[in-house]
Each structure stands twice: as C-alpha cells, then as structure tokens.
Design a protein with these regions (language model features):
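Conserved helicase motor
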Residues: 59, 81-90, 105-110, 144-147, ...
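Conserved pre-motif I regulatory segment
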Residues: 1-25
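Conserved helix-turn-beta segment of the N-terminal RecA-like "Helicase ATP-binding" lobe
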Residues: 60-85, 184-187, 346
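Inter-lobe coupling linker of SF2 helicases/translocases
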Residues: 102-108, 121-129, 144, 148-160, ...
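Conserved helicase ATPase motor motifs in RecA-like P-loop NTPase domains
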Residues: 28-29, 160-174, 182
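Conserved Helicase C-terminal RecA-like lobe
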Residues: 1, 17-18, 30-31, 35-48, ...
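A conserved SF2-helicase RecA2
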Residues: 398-455
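SF2 helicase motor core recognition
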Residues: 109-111, 172-174, 333-339, 359-362, ...
Length: 455
C-alpha cells in the first residue's frame, strides 16, 4: 500500500525548510523520521544543502533511517550510508557519495580528549563544508550534558542547518535544555555558557550536589526558546495498559536486604558486598531487589544471588501468556534470568545487541518469543511494533526518558493491539521508590511539552 503523509506532517516539512535551526519536539510515533527525510529530499532538490548528517543511537543509525527512506515514494531515491565497521571501512563509507550519512552517537568524539577539537575523524570527514551540511540529531536529549564529548564535538562546527528531534527534551527538567538550544543558536536565547544559564534559572540544591530550578524558571525558559521549537503532537497510536505484579521476597531475604541498606555491608554466598557511597548503595539496592549482586572482592568478578523471586515471577508470566514478550532489564545478570524463564516456559529467547541489527527483523517477523533488551540500547528509535505487544520490566529505570522511549518501541503507529506493560516490583525495596520518582518525572515532562502546544 502506498504510504502518504498527513497534512500536519506536510506542514512540519515546510517549517523545517523555512527554519534552518529548529528543535522538533514530537510525540513518539508522530513520524518524525519520515518527516525529516522528506524535508531533506526537498532541501537537496532546492540546492540548499549538499548532504545531511544524522547522529543517532547506534541501532537506529545502523538500520532505521535507511529502512524508513525506502518505504516512501518521495524518499526512496535518497542514498543513505551508515558509518560502521573498522576504521578503514568507515573512512571509505565517509567518502562514498550519498545524500544522508548516519553515524552512531558513540562515534562522535575521540575518547580521552578534553581540550580543543574532540571530534572523531569520522565526524570531521563528514563535516567538511559544514556550512552546506544539515546536522540532524536524532533523540537530541542525548546531548543534554554540556560537558559531554559528544556535545562538544558537534558544537565545534558551524553547521548550515541543525534539526533536533526528540520526544523527551527535558527528562530531568529544564536544565537539560541549554545544550540543545546552544547547538541551534550558539547561546543567544539561554546564555553563552551553562554557567550563565544556571545563574539565571537554577540554584544549587540544599544538599550541595546538583542544581534545581528557581520558581518560575520553566515557563521563562520555554518562552525564551519558543521561536526555536516546533511542537508536534500525535494521537495515541494504540491503547496502553499498565499493571504491577509483585515478586515478594521471603522474610529472611527481606531482612537481609534491610540490614544491608542500614550497614552498607553484607555477605552473600560467602562473598563480600560493600557499598562505598550513598550512590553506590542506591545502585546495589536496586540490584538486590532484582535478584543479584556484583562481588566487591578485589580479586573476584562474580555475581551472587540473594534471591530469585523476580525470575520466578517472570517464568510464571511467560508460561501463562501467549505471544512474544519484550523484556527490559537493567543489570546484566538479569539476562540469565530472562533466558532461564524463557526456557522454563518453553519459549525461544534472544538478547538484543545493537551491533546486530538483523535481530530487529527477526523480532518483527515473529521468530522470537522472548527478547531481552536494555533500554539504553534498544529503547530509542527502533520500530518493534510488528513483533509483539507485551512489555515486561525486570527493573524500572530512574529516567523518564528511558521509560517513555522504551514503551514507545511497541506503542507506535502500526501496532494492531493494545500494548500491555508489566512492571515486576519487589515490595518493601527501592523498587517502590523508583516507581514513585519515575511517575513524577513523567508528569513533569508532560507539563513541559504541554506548555508548547501550538508553538
């Protein structure tokens, strides 16, 4: 069936053409990849740009843009090249004549460089004549850290056009916006430096670590950048239901968890577990709730198991529900739990690996019953809706961005079923705190996007 754009999507294409520096804050599933490719095709036809450079999460850079271009009559002629492989292969790919070059955000900077130009040879090769190139930052919230090498690498060049794409521009609040806006206007709206921005809109937290917004900062910041932002809403592509199931630890297991929380030291299966700081304790409590701990003995690299309640609950769910399941994990030891649960439920298993994009095709073809995936690698930009409609979280993230993006891998256009999202919670543990904090961040993100409706 021939694919066509909606009238609203066509209007956005016109805005991209007319506004060289633009942040498109689009709901997930709004079709921002297709919109952008059509805008690129028109800009190339008009001679406004010579090439487009797409910076994206690795899995998205490897497959999504090329596949999307091939789906549309208006973009199927675009020559899309992805830079991947070893150094010599990438060098040849950068020299290959093309309209769109895709590069993983992990390949933007040279590791270890802290001064001057930190851009990688790949990015430098693509950025030749940057004034006639269009930079497209897919999932632009990935450059929210102004100290990151990837941000400094992109900011080194003066691009002829910049388009930023994201559905989650401020997952931790308005402090995430400065670097995104700087890449568009070099600091004209929010200040030339992050320090100037913080002096005006932020203050140090009472604990002395980190910053928080001053009263009234959010609407003031959004008013200041309104001319740089285009808000694109999308109707919900499908219904989404949420439920929590509980993996209850035994009394002795829960008591051991509480002792560790208080003392920051424990012994499990003869191995020492120590939290050296408050931050380390938070991470280890989340791991404990999920059923594992990494040893802190200097000479031992081993995972020990304080309980297996989440694995058992996952086994029960997989055995009782038909259809494929996308299982998001946070700790690597959970991969073994998902694999074990799938085997016990007599279902096929695979673990998503961004280095092997063919696994996306296998999932969408219905060849995988249970796919384990980390939200940082598979949570952004991938089209997984044809492969299933059930999501299970072994461990919820603190980040609203990772949560929303991960759920949107199935809850997007083309999904034929209600998406069912299940969280496995260990009662009496940090899982409950994470769930509460996550809900607040999702609400704050929605308020920011709602502020720019019609902008």
């Amino acid at each position: 069936m021939k694919k066509t754009l909606t009238s609203e999507q066509c209007d956005v294409i016109g805005q991209i053409i007319d506004r060289p520096y633009l942040a498109l804050w689009a709901d997930m599933g709004a079709g921002k990849t297709a919109i952008t490719l059509h805008a690129v095709a028109e800009l190339l036809r008009l001679g406004f740009i010579r090439r487009a450079i797409v910076v994206a999460p690795r899995a998205v850079a490897d497959s999504t843009w090329r596949q999307e271009a091939a789906l549309w009559p208006g973009t199927s002629h675009l020559r899309v090249v992805t830079l991947r492989g070893d150094k010599s292969v990438r060098r040849e790919q950068a020299r290959t004549p093309a309209d769109v070059y895709c590069i993983g955000r992990d390949a933007l900077a040279v590791p270890g460089l802290h001064r001057g130009c930190v851009a990688s040879p790949d990015l430098i090769a693509l950025a030749g004549d940057a004034g006639r190139a269009m930079l497209i930052v897919d999932e632009a919230s990935s450059i929210k850290n102004s100290q990151s090498a990837r941000f400094r690498a992109l900011a080194w060049f003066r691009w002829g056009r910049v388009l930023e794409l994201t559905g989650t521009p401020a997952p931790q609040g308005i402090g995430d916006i400065w670097s995104q806006m700087y890449l568009l206007d070099r600091g004209a709206a929010l200040g030339k430096t992050i320090t100037a921005f913080r002096q005006r809109y932020m203050r140090r937290k009472e604990c002395g670590f980190g910053f928080e917004e001053v009263p009234g900062a959010a609407p003031a910041v959004l008013d200041a950048v309104r001319h740089l932002v285009l808000r694109l809403e999308a109707p919900p592509p499908c219904d989404v239901t949420y439920r929590d199931v509980y993996a209850q630890m035994g009394d002795a297991e829960l008591e051991a968890y509480r002792r560790f929380k208080k003392s920051m030291v424990a012994e499990i299966q003869g191995r020492e577990i120590t939290a050296v700081s408050a931050g380390a304790l938070v991470a280890k409590l989340a791991a404990w709730a999920s059923g594992g701990q990494y040893c802190t003995d200097a000479d031992i690299r081993e995972t020990v198991r304080p309980h297996c309640r989440k694995r058992d609950e996952l086994t029960r769910i997989l055995a009782s529900e038909r259809g494929p399941h996308l299982v998001f994990y946070w700790f690597n030891f959970s991969i073994d739990d998902v694999k074990s649960a799938a085997r016990a439920a007599r279902k096929s298993f695979a673990c998503f690996d961004a280095r092997h994009p063919e696994i996306v095709d296998a999932w969408n073809a219905g060849e995988i019953d249970v796919m384990a995936a980390h939200p940082q690698s598979a949570g952004m930009g991938l089209n997984l809706q044809r492969g299933g409609h059930r999501i299970i979280w072994m461990t919820c993230p603190w980040s609203s961005e990772l949560w929303l993006q991960a759920v949107a891998r199935l809850a997007r256009r083309g999904q034929a079923h209600t998406v069912e999202v299940t969280r496995i919670i260990a009662p009496g543990t940090i899982d409950e705190r994470i769930s509460h904090v996550l809900g607040g961040k999702i609400d704050a993100q929605k308020l920011i996007l709602d502020e720019l409706k019609g902008g």
